[in-house]
Amino acid sequence: MSSKVFLRDKVHVNVGTIGHVDHGKTTLTAAITKILSTKGLAENKSYDQIDKTKEEKERGITINTTHVSYETVKRHYAHVDCPGHADYVKNMITGAAQMDAGILVVSAYHGVMPQTREHVLLAGQVGISKLIVFLNKCDLVKEEEWIHLVEMEVRELLNEYKFDGDKTPFVRGSALKALEGTDVEGINKLLEVLDEYIEDPIRDVEKPFLMPVEGVHTITGRGTVATGRVERGKIKISEEVEIIGLKETKKAIITGLEMFKKELDFAQAGDNVGILLRGITRDQIERGQVLAKPGSLNAYHKFLSQVYILTQQEGGRHTAFFSNYRPQFYFRTTDVTGFIKLKKDVKMVLPGDRTELIVELNHPIAIEAGTKFSIREGGRTIGAGTVTEIIE
């Protein structure tokens, strides 16, 4: 863990880039850090540093979510760069769940594409209420009319998924040109809009501590570190937490807290943190579990839910499903297979239906009434739901 201390002298906001593969999310993230680094407000992160894994470099696409941090004069931002490729949507869901607001990157050259639509749907599902649209690659489009048509198409899409498409700010630019240093105006405008359009987040610090585990690392000689975004509550060093879900519940003492390689006295809702846990080995904790205040949460495998099933036009199923249907259920940072039971008076569920479902998961996970989830099958999102009642 680090020896530098994280200063809470500015409002902390979690943002991120979402959108279709190759529309420029990672290039935009790199351009933001480069431009702010010249003002001493960020560490310059190259495209290759953000697209970290060997497979990402070879395929030229983002697979895992990547976190960078930067500041404006007004705020401190934690920025998640989400994968746009359809195969890695589950990592996108994890990243989006950590955001207070999103930057939807749309190539002005290509317009709305399948993952543009899916990411907007999922952003709403995980609780993001505001998006800013960055129309990228504007330098490749010669006709102003074309950019205007793409903007109209995106506004319609936002309205369709209950975002305020009419009032959503649009910023035009070229992330690549900005990264090359020839046209930085779009990036400066985007940062200005981030500061002004996105309100200071209201943090849920009074409720019991809860953090979904996104990653797990070992520090030789120190112990095991769990990383993630604190969903609610506060925690400080020497306090006890429970590790809940997927396996038998375990207890651990917190011996260190860190955010962006700087030490914290305490962590609170909204912080992206690494938590050092005493007495826990690498194989006793995994992504998809949660850290929670002891006694505040339990793991369950059967629940009642209210669900919306997407239409074919929304990228969902083409056909109905029946009892014993077995898709994947995505909660916070985990995905679990389970099966659906329909209520006695319901014979089948059609695309476009809003319905009540009984869900039984293969593994127990930390859930409670109000927990949101996505339903996926064969690489696409087919439904969005909320837990209404725990059964067992």
From Swiss-Prot:
HAMAP family according to UniProt: EF_Tu_B
Keywords from the named record: Cytoplasm, Elongation factor, GTP-binding, Hydrolase, Magnesium, Metal-binding, Nucleotide-binding, Protein biosynthesis
Keyword Transmembrane on entry: no
Enzyme class: hydrolase
A single cellular component GO annotation: cytoplasm
Keyword Transmembrane: no
The tr-type G domain, residue ranges: 10-202
Chain residue ranges for the region called G3: 81-84
Binding locations of Mg(2+): T26
Reaction(s) the record says it catalyses: GTP + H2O = GDP + phosphate + H(+)
Chain spans, region G4: 136-139
Record region (G5): 174-176
Protein name as catalogued: Elongation factor Tu
G1, as annotated region: 19-26
Compartment list: Cytoplasm
Function of the protein: GTP hydrolase that promotes the GTP-dependent binding of aminoacyl-tRNA to the A-site of ribosomes during protein biosynthesis.
Primary location recorded for the protein, binned into one broad class: cytoplasm
Gene Ontology MF term list: GTP binding; GTPase activity; translation elongation factor activity
Residues given in the record as GTP binding sites: 19-26, 81-85, 136-139
CDD domains for the chain: EF_Tu (cd01884), EFTU_II (cd03697), EFTU_III (cd03707)
InterPro entries linked: EF-Tu_GTP-bd, EF-Tu_GTPase, EFTu-like_2, EFTU_2, G_TR_CS, P-loop_NTPase, Small_GTP-bd, T_Tr_GTP-bd_dom
Highest taxon of the lineage: Bacteria
Pfam families hit by this protein: GTP_EFTU, GTP_EFTU_D2, GTP_EFTU_D3
Disulfide bonds: none
Family: Belongs to the TRAFAC class translation factor GTPase superfamily. Classic translation factor GTPase family. EF-Tu/EF-1A subfamily.
Subunit text: Monomer.
